Structures are given as structure tokens and as C-alpha cells.
UniProtKB/Swiss-Prot annotation:
Gene3D superfamilies: 3.30.1370.30, 3.30.1490.10. SUPFAM superfamilies: Ribosomal protein S8 (SSF56047). This is Small ribosomal subunit protein uS8. The gene is rpsH. One of its GO terms (molecular function) is structural constituent of ribosome. Belongs to the universal ribosomal protein uS8 family. PROSITE patterns: RIBOSOMAL_S8. GO terms for biological process: translation. Part of the 30S ribosomal subunit. Contacts proteins S5 and S12. GO terms for cellular component: ribonucleoprotein complex; ribosome. Keywords: Ribonucleoprotein, Ribosomal protein, RNA-binding, rRNA-binding. One of the primary rRNA binding proteins, it binds directly to 16S rRNA central domain where it helps coordinate assembly of the platform of the 30S subunit.
Length: 131
């Protein structure tokens, strides 16, 4: 059993993009699906599908690459960890990497990006960053 499903998922995405794989498989969790929806919306992944196999669900992710074959994921980091939670207020969630990167924040209004959290005037737990 994986202790930190978000860190495991981000590591699998990072490893698959470095190896230039087209697809990768992640463990299913609602929080992982919420993060993947943000990644898809921002163009870091092409698509993802949830599949059932022997009463266990998996998420299959199709990675996105540019026309030269480079991955759209340059770096992905887990910021808040089970042993050390990181929380930020609204005014600490401004632009990241001059708008090229995204910070994923878990708020009372759901899992959203740092820019949406700033617009909605909410803070929360900083889950991960990607650029």
C-alpha cells in the first residue's frame, strides 16, 4: 500500500514523461482525478481514463508532448507532504513561474489552481506544483 498516493502519482507522471512514454497507469483516488483534471485543463496531459480491473480502479493517463517530442511537463513537485503540511493564504497564491506553471491547492471550494484560489479569495493546502 502506498502511503502518499499523490506523491506516487506525481512520481509516475515524472518518470513516464522522462522516458517519453505515451501512457502511464496511476492508482485511483478522487484527489488524484481532481489533480489530473487541472493538468488536462492546463495542457500538461492529453487525457485520462478510469478503468476497473478486478474490483480495483486505475487511472490511465495519456501524456502530452510538443511537436519536437519534448514533454510538456518540465518539473512536478509535491509540496505538502503527510509529515509536513503546507498551507498558504490567498495573498501568498499569486502567479507561479510567470504564468507558465501551476500550483494545485486543496481549498474549501475543492481542488483548484493557485490563480483560481486567488480570484475566489480562498487559501488552502498546497498539494503540488507543475511547470
Amino acid at each position: 500500500m502506498v502511503n502518499d498516493i499523490i506523491a506516487d502519482s506525481l512520481t509516475r507522471l515524472r518518470n513516464a514523461s522522462m522516458r517519453r512514454l505515451e501512457f502511464t497507469q496511476l492508482y485511483y483516488a478522487k484527489i488524484v482525478v481532481s489533480i489530473l483534471e487541472i493538468f488536462k485543463e492546463k495542457g500538461f496531459i492529453k487525457d485520462f481514463n478510469i478503468k476497473d480491473k478486478d474490483k480495483k480502479q486505475s487511472v490511465y493517463v495519456q501524456l502530452a508532448y510538443d511537436e519536437k517530442g519534448y514533454s510538456k511537463i518540465s518539473e512536478v513537485k509535491r509540496l505538502s507532504k503527510p509529515g509536513r503540511r503546507v498551507y498558504k493564504q490567498k495573498n501568498e497564491l499569486k502567479r507561479f513561474k510567470n504564468g507558465y506553471g501551476v500550483i494545485v491547492v486543496s481549498t474549501s471550494k475543492g481542488v483548484i489552481t493557485n490563480e483560481e484560489a486567488y480570484r475566489q479569495n480562498v487559501g488552502g493546502e498546497v498539494l503540488c506544483s507543475i511547470w
